[in-house]
A protein has these predicted regions:
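N-terminal pre-domain/capping segments
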Residues: 2-127, 134, 150, 195
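Extracytoplasmic/secreted envelope proteins and their assembly/folding machinery
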Residues: 54, 149-152, 180, 184
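Alpha-helix capping at helix-to-loop junctions
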Residues: 122, 154-157, 161
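Active-site groove signature of glycoside hydrolases
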Residues: 125-141, 162-173
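Active-site cleft segment of glycoside hydrolase catalytic domains centered on the general acid/base Glu
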Residues: 138-152
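Short helix-to-loop capping/linker segments positioned immediately adjacent to catalytic or ligand/cofactor-binding
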Residues: 143, 155-157, 171
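Histidine/acidic residue-rich metal-binding segments in metalloenzymes
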Residues: 148-157, 188-190
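Acidic/histidine-rich catalytic cores of soluble enzymes
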Residues: 159-198
Length: 198
């Protein structure tokens, strides 16, 4: 178990160094790689109940869990007020940190956005990954970005109300944020305390 943890941490450090390019190095006087927590995205454990999931993560040496709180996830949005506290309790009882959840939130006016944000804030969870945004093929790229800029502005406002941070995960391909310059346009006027990119 310990060698797996070291492999994950060392690999993450190496990949980070490669990704950030020249001029970035780990200093022996700086952050110790052993102090970097390793979290697991729980999507692959959705077949387990909360206690079983927590036991597996603890047995495998993970420090934290990015819990799937979305359609098809461990916690369904319609059950968030009841099930998220149960999931967090099981994780924390197993010594697993729950500082982030993964959601499908991409609309501040969706019926589940506020209940999810309230539930996570009540549990002391400060970060969530929000859902993807798609381009409307009937609109130009600049028109799409202007529409999504309004979405980011509204999500920032709702996040501020609950004291949480939403991070957009960009993926390559045809989704908004695939070309990373989209994100500059969407985030340049936003407060990074409440909204950003993961």
């Amino acid at each position: 178990m310990n060698s797996r943890r070291n492999f994950i941490r060392t690999s993450a450090a190496g990949i980070t160094g490669i990704t950030l390019g020249q001029g970035f190095t780990f200093s022996s006087s700086g952050t110790n790689i052993k102090d970097m927590p390793v979290h697991a995205f729980t999507k692959c454990l959705q077949f387990l109940d909360f206690d079983e999931m927590s036991e597996v993560l603890a047995a495998r040496g993970f420090d934290g869990a990015d819990l799937a709180v979305r359609p098809g996830g461990q916690v369904l949005p319609e059950n968030v007020a009841v099930d998220l506290p149960k999931a967090v309790k099981a994780l924390r009882n197993a010594g697993i940190d729950t500082s982030m959840i993964v959601t499908a939130i991409n609309n501040p006016d969706d019926q589940f956005t506020r209940p999810i944000l309230k539930s996570m804030a009540d549990l002391g969870i400060k970060n969530y990954r929000f859902g993807y945004l798609d381009y409307d093929n009937k609109l130009s790229v600049p028109e799409n970005l202007e529409l999504h800029k309004i979405t980011f502005e509204k999500l920032e406002k709702v996040n501020r109300e609950y004291g949480v941070h939403g991070g957009y995960q960009n993926h390559s391909g045809r989704r908004v944020g695939g070309p990373v310059w989209d994100l500059y346009h969407l985030l340049k006027d936003r407060n990074p305390e409440f909204i950003g990119v993961q």
